[in-house]
Structure formats: structure tokens, C-alpha cells
């Protein structure tokens, strides 16, 4: 798994290289780091980093619902159409493991956000 923090990696050649070696790229939902939703390996790792400690569940219910749908879509072998991809080519179809890590600056409400996501995807 590779986590990039510079937009210079947002090029199709980088995605092709990761796919060649079946290496997942981290999807970072972050204000600074690039968000790359391309599926490049046999699992997806998402870092949800825009939570808000003012919200009891870290994210508003509509956003939690949207994330649950995305995570389920990835798990079922699909790809969310509402997240940015670098390469328009679709990944191989098929079920895959999905790991979602809820974390942000304050971290106080991140566990509540993770528990809410678990309830929505199970």
C-alpha cells in the first residue's frame, strides 16, 4: 500500500505502475493531500480525515450514509463515481476487502464516526 501526499502522483502512469504490481493506493479524504480513488490492488484503504469534533458522530448522517455506500460499492467490486480518479480505466471487478480509517486533527469524535460507519455497512 502506498500513501502519496503530493499531487504530482496524480497521473495515469503512476496508477498504471501501481496496478502492474497490484499495489493499493490510499484514498485520502483530506484538505491537503491528493484524493485518489483509483482501485490499484486487491483491497481498498480509505483514510477519512475530514471529521468534525463538533459533530457527535464525527460526520453528519448524510455523509456517513454516502461513505457507507462507497465502502460497500468498493467491497462488492465496484467503484464510486463521485470520488476523483486519475485514470478513467476501471479496475478489475470482483469482491475486495475494504479498510476505512476514521481520523482527523482533534480525534475526539473519530471513534464514534467509525462505529457509525460499522453500523451502516453491516
Features from the language model and the residues they span:
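Residues lining hydrophobic/aromatic ligand-binding pockets adjacent to catalytic sites
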Residues: 1-122
Amino acid at each position: 500500500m502506498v500513501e502519496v501526499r503530493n499531487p504530482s502522483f496524480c497521473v495515469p502512469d503512476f496508477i498504471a505502475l501501481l496496478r502492474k504490481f497490484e499495489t493499493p493506493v490510499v484514498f485520502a479524504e483530506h484538505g491537503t493531500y491528493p484524493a485518489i480513488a483509483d482501485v490499484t490492488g486487491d483491497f481498498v484503504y480509505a483514510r477519512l480525515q475530514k471529521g468534525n469534533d463538533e459533530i457527535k458522530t464525527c460526520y453528519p448522517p448524510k455523509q456517513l450514509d454516502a461513505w457507507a455506500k462507497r465502502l460497500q460499492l468498493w467491497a462488492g467490486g465496484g467503484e464510486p463515481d463521485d470520488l476523483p480518479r486519475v485514470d478513467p480505466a476501471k479496475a478489475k471487478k470482483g469482491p475486495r476487502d475494504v479498510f476505512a480509517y476514521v481520523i482527523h486533527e482533534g480525534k475526539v469524535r473519530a471513534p464514534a464516526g467509525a462505529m457509525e460507519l460499522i453500523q451502516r455497512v453491516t
